C-alpha cells in the first residue's frame, strides 16, 4: 500500500517540528517546502539522517517548487512571518495575506485533493483567505488554533488541580486571539465538571478566571519569553493531532477554525468551533448550546474575526 504524503508548506520552527513528528510517527513521506530552499532541504536531510536512530522509514525531501507537493494527502501551512514581542497576531495581516495567495494557488494546482490545515496567523482570517485563494471545498480546509488553545487551557487546569493532563478535557471556542472563549462549563477533570471541582474546594473562581486569562494570552507569554519567534512544539503537536484524525478516519471531536454556514448564527466565516474530523475532512460541526454570557463572548470574538476578514478584502480586492 502506498504511503501517505504529507506536505509541509513553510520550513521554519513549526514546519521542522512537524516534519520530525510526522517522520517519527510514520504518518507518511514528508515534503518540506520553503522559498528558502536550503532550509527545507537541510531540515529534511537532518531528520532523514536521524531516522536510522529512531527506526522509522519515512522518506523526507525539501523543495522550493510547489510541484514537489503534488498529490499530497495532507498539507499543513505554516508559511508566513511569526510574531515578535509586542506584536499581536493581527499585526501580521498584510504580510501573511500575500503569502496565503501564493500558497493557495500552489495547493490548488498541485494538491487539490489534500486536507489542508492552516497555522499561519492571524489564523481565522488566514484560513478564510487560503480557502478563497485555493477554491478547495470548505470541509477540506481548516485552521489549527482550538486544539492548541485547549491544550494550554488543559495544562493550566491540570497544574492547578494537581492531576494528570490525561484526565483533563477542555476546549476553547472563537477566534485565535485575545477574544477567544475558554469554556469552563464544558471542561472536566475525569468527567467531573470543573465548576463542581471548584465547589468542592479544589480551587477558587478567582483562580479559574486567572487561568482563562492566561489561556487567552498564552501565545503572547511564549513570544515574550523567547524574544524571537513564537511557539512551535505545541502548535506542531496540535496540527499532527488533526492530521492523524483525518488520515486514520478517527472522527475525533476537536476545536478547529472551521467554515460556518449558519451554525452558531454565523455565515461565510471561519472561526473556532468543535468539529468531527474524519476521512471526509470536517464531517460535522458540533453546535453546542451556549449560555447568555458564553454567547456574548463568542459574538464578540466573531466580530473581531469579521473585522480581520474585512481588512483582508480591503487589502486584496479579489477577495471581495
From Swiss-Prot:
Keywords: NAD, Oxidoreductase, Tricarboxylic acid cycle
EC number: 1.1.1.37
Signal peptide as annotated in the record: none
Record field: catalytic activity: (S)-malate + NAD(+) = oxaloacetate + NADH + H(+)
Gene Ontology molecular function terms on file: L-lactate dehydrogenase activity; L-malate dehydrogenase (NAD+) activity
GO terms of biological process kind: lactate metabolic process; tricarboxylic acid cycle
Annotated substrate binding sites: 83, 89, 121, 152
Keyword Flavoprotein annotated: no
Residues noted as binding NAD(+) in the record, renumbered to the chain: 10-15, 34, 96, 119-121
Keyword NAD: yes
SUPFAM superfamilies, sorted: LDH C-terminal domain-like (SSF56327), NAD(P)-binding Rossmann-fold domains (SSF51735)
Active-site residue list: 176 (proton acceptor)
HAMAP family linked to this entry: Malate_dehydrog_3
NCBIfam families in alphabetical order: MalateDH_bact, PRK06223.1
Job of this protein: Catalyzes the reversible oxidation of malate to oxaloacetate.
Family the entry assigns: Belongs to the LDH/MDH superfamily. MDH type 3 family.
Protein name stated in the entry: Malate dehydrogenase
Gene for this chain: mdh
Amino acid at each position: 500500500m502506498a504511503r501517505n504524503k504529507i506536505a509541509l508548506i513553510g520550513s521554519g520552527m513549526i514546519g521542522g517540528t512537524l516534519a520530525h513528528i510526522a517522520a517519527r510517527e510514520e504518518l507518511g513521506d514528508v515534503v518540506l517546502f520553503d522559498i528558502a530552499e536550503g532550509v527545507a532541504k537541510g531540515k529534511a536531510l537532518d531528520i532523514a539522517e536521524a531516522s536510522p536512530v529512531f527506526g522509522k522509514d519515512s522518506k523526507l525531501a525539501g523543495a522550493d517548487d510547489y510541484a514537489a507537493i503534488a498529490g499530497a494527502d495532507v498539507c499543513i501551512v505554516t508559511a508566513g512571518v511569526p510574531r515578535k514581542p509586542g506584536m499581536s497576531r493581527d499585526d501580521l495581516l498584510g504580510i501573511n495575506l500575500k503569502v496565503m495567495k501564493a500558497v493557495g494557488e500552489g495547493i490548488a494546482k498541485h494538491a487539490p485533493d489534500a486536507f489542508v490545515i492552516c497555522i499561519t496567523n492571524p489564523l481565522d482570517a488566514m484560513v478564510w483567505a487560503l480557502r478563497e485563494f485555493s477554491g478547495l471545498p470548505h470541509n477540506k480546509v481548516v485552521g489549527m488554533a482550538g486544539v492548541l488553545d485547549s491544550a494550554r487551557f488543559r495544562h493550566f487546569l491540570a497544574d492547578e488541580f494537581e492531576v494528570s493532563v490525561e484526565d483533563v478535557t477542555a476546549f476553547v471556542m472563537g477566534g485565535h486571539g485575545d477574544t477567544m472563549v475558554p469554556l469552563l462549563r464544558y471542561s472536566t477533570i475525569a468527567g467531573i465538571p470543573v465548576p463542581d471541582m471548584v465547589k468542592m474546594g479544589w480551587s477558587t473562581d478567582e483562580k479559574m478566571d486567572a487561568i482563562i486569562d492566561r489561556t487567552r494570552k498564552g501565545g503572547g507569554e511564549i513570544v515574550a519569553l523567547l524574544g524571537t519567534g513564537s511557539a512551535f512544539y505545541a502548535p506542531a503537536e496540535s496540527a499532527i493531532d488533526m492530521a492523524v484524525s483525518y488520515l486514520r478516519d478517527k472522527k475525533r471531536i476537536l476545536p478547529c477554525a472551521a467554515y460556518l454556514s449558519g451554525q452558531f448564527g454565523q455565515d461565510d466565516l471561519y472561526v473556532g468551533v468543535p468539529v468531527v474530523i474524519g476521512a471526509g475532512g470536517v464531517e460535522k460541526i458540533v453546535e453546542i448550546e451556549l449560555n447568555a454570557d458564553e454567547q456574548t463572548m463568542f459574538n464578540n470574538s466573531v466580530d473581531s474575526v469579521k473585522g480581520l476578514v474585512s481588512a483582508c478584502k480591503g487589502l486584496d480586492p479579489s477577495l471581495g
